[in-house]
Amino acid sequence: MLPITTGAPTFDELLSDEFETLPGHPGDADRAANRLAAWCKSASSGDWALFRRRLARDGYSVDHVLARFGSARRALSASPGFNDEAWVRAAFIDVADRSAPYAGDCPFGHLFLPLIRTAEARLWASLDESISDLLLPSARNCVRQKLLGDVSALCAPVLYERFAEARNYGNFIAEMAPGGFLRLLDDKPVLLRLLASLTRQWLDTTHEFVTRLQTDIDAIRRDLLNVPHASAVARIEGGLSDPHRGGRSVLVVEFDDGLRALYKPKDLRIDAAWQRLVERLNARAPIDLRVAHVLARDGYGWTEFVGHTECRGSHEFASFFRRAGAWLALMHCFVVADMHQENVIAVGDQPVPVDLETTLQAAEESHSDNVDAKAYDAAREIISDSVMAVGLLPAYGRSAGDTVFAVGGVASDWATQRRLTWTDINSDGMRPSIKDEADRPTTNLAHLGGRYASLAEHLDDFVSGFEDYARFLMSTGLLLDGFAAVPVRKVVRPTQFYSMLLHRLKDDRMMDDGVRWSVQADFLARLADWDRDADPRWPLQRAERSALLELNVPFFVMQSEGTGITDTAGTVVPTSAKPGLQRARERMLRLDDRQIAWQVEVIRQAAASIDDQPKQLVPIDQAATPTQDAFIAEASKIAEEIAEAAIRRDSAAAWIGLGSVAASDVSQLAVLGHDLYSGNAGIALFFAAHAKTGCESSADNALAAVAHLRSELKSRNASHVIRVLGVGGATGLGSVVYALTAMSRLMSDDDLLADAHRAAMLLTDDLIASDKRLDVVGGSAGAILSLLALYADTGADDVLKRALVCAEHLAGADRVGLVGMSHGAAGCAYALASAATVSGRDDFADAARECIEFERANFDAERGDWRDLRVTEPHWRSQWCHGAVGIGLARLAMTKRAAAEPDTVLADIDDALIGATRGWPGHVDTLCCGTLGSIELCREAGRVLNRAELVERASRRLLAVLRTEAATGDYRWNVGTRKFNVGLFRGLAGVGYTCLREIDDSIPNVLIWE
């Protein structure tokens, strides 16, 4: 039977046949309209045309939804169920129970004791009395604390809002028990719904676990613990995995003799198959591997507890990474994914995978019929068929707050997690705070005496292990025996995305209405494919919503040789994906020396992204005399090189290269995106500039580079694409506007200008309001500069209006206290001053002046540079992104585009030139962080200030960079080599673009959004 919800039905429930529409009453229409508007905002960002299509996919009309949202009741024909909300609410009436002493560490724990004891009574009454022989009182208390902790975590934030006014804990508890808490539940019926749901999940999953433990205890002792004697359970620890499928999660079972085992409430046949495979391979393999021993049962199982232990000596660090490389070879062949830090435990010199559920992953389907997407899809397939897809190698992710974190089974820097903590719990001084979880144990890496091994130090060992084991697998047959017809987990979306939605659903501000609360989960609809009339994966969204509204992470499985995705209810959604077992067979057939060499190249590139060793400072010779031929030749050579690296399909091109992560200093191997900074728009702009030399192939390459982008701007999925991009002028939608505008000018192509205008109109008020970065690279400052460049070419009032909305957002926001062009005050000052010039608004000019004054206060006259405020230790950089170069360019640009105070600006330009000279030549040859940015400052200053010696200096320095490359074989990059550094701000396209600007001053300066 299903649970019956009384006071807070979700929108899915209300629109189902379980409910029926009632005649309307006064006020119902307003409530219905508010609910519908909230749904539209969540599902389509307020786009009513798109929202109507979303309704139609489920067979709804606006009129039907409004009628049901106005007034409805549970239908008499509705299926029978059980009403947990009734007895959960009734439990809080027990005042006597609340007077019992409580000395725990759960905030407001006193209030929840009646529910906990009522639920406990129901649980133990449903189990056999003999369970007391198996579970010691300490174990039963662990079970109890699990429910108490979950209930407290859910309710404490909303209770604290009320407690903060009283500040007397004893009086507050007396007031809330029972009347005050019951009134709270009446005011927020969703809170009661969630309390009932959590309690029901605890009852069902605990009953299931205890019953299974009682059934399997003898086998656990015999097959996993290797002990013949009986022992009782002393502790049960949870929190080792996200809750799935009705609150089920991994538990650690500790017996009174200290031995431990893991309970996993999911099918473990894939784990058992791995155990048999590794045991078979170890008999002949060049290096032995280890997996956890498994006791598989029907739909669940038990595994040995794998503890993190240190090496016997530092010599074992090398063997640890050889084994890690061997694991990568094996996992790559078996199409494993999601092998991040938490799924690997270092046991001495053995890296032990502890969760192999994402083995034999089916290929991701391409749902697009768009011919312009074929090149991108082909590039994405190359990445998904590489060792990067395993998740063992270091990579980077981006949090909701734009913080960059490292991921990967052999990564050393774990993501810093933020969590709610409480101080002075259950006292008058109790307070919550959000804290970073620091000093998390690096359990995935080998260690000795507190020192952890790193991949950077043992890369050759890792590569050796990979190569040796891959060649061993080439000569080994029947690898896939035992892997047919086994279920494997299918991760439909990143867990981090689900966590974001769960965070919203736990916010009590929407808990007064079940519909407005539940439509937050329909944010998923934004990610559907709206270019088609029907999205094959649309049915999965209902299952995702159902799980999320129970505060669970959605869970799906596929058969290893199948193509259908199965949800928790057993519903199968067919797909056209290539089955995982077929992919594994094909990989093993393709495995040869050439494939191994390519994968080793990928490994070394991934490892380079975590190498923080300082770049060698190479002397640069500036003695030669510059000639235009040298610059044209280098630009043409680079154009040819980038063109050869392209993946071409029909009229579109894509590249695999180093893409920046969240506008940060880190890069990783990926299919390049649409942006100007490191993506296709920047490459296209370089090709457009090179086309001015008369090169027809570069004109074709320029259009091919943005073909996919332009088609997406016109597609029904455009809102999702721009939401991922953000608004910024280097990495966001603003960068697209600027690139298309500049390309249209260089190529005399009005269609490109029309698409730039189309992109500008996608910068909606809602998207701008969501911008928290604010800077020129990723935020509103960059959007302003990009839009004003388009406005200069079109004079379109609607473009100017978008720019001024961005300026209002930037001027009214709390800007981050940083200096510099890319993320700091210089870029914001330039953008705001530019907006002030075109609008005549004093508030923008005042805000720009504040930014300049802030920057002046952080200038160090002795060093001739501005201090980098991102780090606590005194540090100075002379780059475009941070320091003198960018600040100087921003001030120079202000003299051209914006009204400014001449004396202050000119003084800053002089200081910037001094700082840039002291910082020359730096460690890299890029526009963003190195020599090319410094060259652009000299060139721009020479032209603006009519100082010929600066223009000459820029020319000589650029030639020196080219000559040094010719002597050493490559330019100096932030990460890796030229093969994957193809972008504009940090790659070859930037070198070529700088060369072209040397010979043609009509090519716009991209560093100031000219």
Region roles according to the model:
Residues 2-171, 177-214, 350-636:
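C-terminal catalytic region of ATP-dependent kinase domains
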Residues 104, 108, 176, 180-183, ...:
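Generic alpha-helix detector with strongest preference for long hydrophobic helices that associate
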Residues 118-336, 341, 347-352, 357:
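Conserved ATP-binding subdomain of kinase catalytic cores across diverse folds
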Residues 284-319, 330-368, 372-435, 454, ...:
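Glycan-recognition and catalytic cores of secretory/periplasmic carbohydrate-active enzymes
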